[in-house]
Amino acid sequence: MPEVTKLMEDFKAAVAAGNEKQQGWPSAAYAVSKAGIIGMTRAVAEEEKGRGRGVLVNSCCPGYVKTDMTRGGGAKTPDQGAQTPVMLAIGDIGGKAGLFWQNEKVIEW
């Protein structure tokens, strides 16, 4: 996890200095934050695997959901957006961990 934290701190410092684009970072902080979440998911999943407790850690995107955040412009209803998170919480995902999911499928990232 220290590697992911360092990357996020590097991005934060680049933004504070106003030179994130020159350093090769994307212009959207939202995208960088999501990449950080995916990286952290992988790191925590590996830690949990080593503990042998059977805890599965994954991350997911609900999709573009009709919410206040999207000002009602989403293509999915909140119930549709909740399908993948609920599946990850209570469904049989075959012991998969450290992955990124969308539309109830693993997305390579």
Which stretches of residues belong to each language-model region?
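C-terminal helical subdomain
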Residues: 59-62, 67, 71-109
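Catalytic loop of short-chain dehydrogenase/reductase
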Residues: 1-50, 61
